[in-house]
Amino acid sequence: LSAINTQEVLPTPDSRLPTGPIWLEDESQRIGLVNIPGDLWKNMRRSKIWFLDIPFEERLKHIVPEYGVLDQEKLIAAIERISQKLGNLNAKTAILLLKEGKIAESFEILLKYYDKFYFRSLHNREGLQALLHTVNCKSVSTENADILLREAAAASQTPLA
């Protein structure tokens, strides 16, 4: 899920949920201006984590065309909302680079912030060692879904120690 489509896919009280596994991106409870409902959030925090370990530069190459086309004013507003956590200098620099059309350079600052924040949050997760499964991937690709499903199937066949 991303902040862009989170609100569209979250279940409503009258929606029927699938009975099998549901794969969600590990996110903060608040994504942009949207909050993940409390019960779903608690369930996510207790569930297995399949971490796709993709090189930084590959992820950066992926997000620039995907997010770089979004409305610049909305991107700036989002940066301003996280400016205290990002650091005022980093926020000002990211905004300036964005205004200059240097999207990759701006997003590099933001992705470094995201990674730092995510890893801190991940490593504060209760029972992380038992929940975390790392899957090494070379790039951002639809093939990663196949790799992930193979790894998950193999892990479910592994006897518990």
Model-derived features: positions:
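Conserved nucleotide-sensing/catalytic segment adjacent to the nucleotide-binding pocket
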Residues: 1-43
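Conserved NTP phosphate-binding and transfer environment spanning the P-loop NTPase/kinase superfamily
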Residues: 43-49, 53-161
